[in-house]
Amino acid sequence: MAAYVVVEVRVNDPVRYEEYRKTVAPTLEAYGGRFLARGGKVERLEGSWSPKRLVIVEFPDVATAKAWWSSSEYANPKAIRQSASETEMIVVEGI
């Protein structure tokens, strides 16, 4: 069953974050991940949540998403992202 990693990103260092953007895709592909949304326009429909940047990544399942997140392939890009931004990240199981 598909799983989705949903990330709210607040970029603090745009130059460093661009390094992350350039290095993350191959790590996703190695785990069957693909971007569904990556920083496009966000429009609130209800409530008070107003993320400036939102990313959604699809994986084959939750276990694979978690394996990617903790993988050695993602370790360096993750460190770059963590130093360049503040993020909230969840994984949700699809239907």
How should these model regions be labeled?
Residues 82-95:
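C-terminal end-helix/capping segment
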